[in-house]
Amino acid sequence: QDKQLVPLDEYINTKRKKVNGISIIVDIDGTIAEMNGRGPFEWHKVSHDKSRKFVLDMIEGVVKENDCFVVYLSGRDAICEDDTRKWIYDNTCDYTFSNDWQLYMRNKNDTRKDRIVKEEIFWNVVAPKYNVIGVFDDRPQVLQMWHELKLPNVICVGNPFISF
């Protein structure tokens, strides 16, 4: 198959974003994905999740306005990484950020709380590479952690009264 050439301005823009590191952190479950016929730990069913178009539209607006990169930071077990990547691609293909993102997930069989796993990934991988200008998440414990880290523009897109 022939590779398509990317227009020069698009190529430069993409390179600039990655070097510049301006980004937003986006959670998956409960934020951009709504569980559809599965429990929170049924990783083999993540491909059936429904997208939350309203939230994706908000993310699209932030990406366009700030010319930033999307960092998906998920508490999902890495056992479903391939399905998660495919789900992201399939459900964001209509958005400008569909090919301009990175995914970080918890290690396989890591059962620690989301806030602990995400904070660890943040300090080890995200903070050294990216200038985070906002966060989209749904879990109260994780939202609190982002606030404690003093990240700007922490946006709750779920029901803050539901915990598991």
Predicted region positions:
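Non-catalytic pre-domain segments flanking phosphatase-related domains
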Residues: 1-26
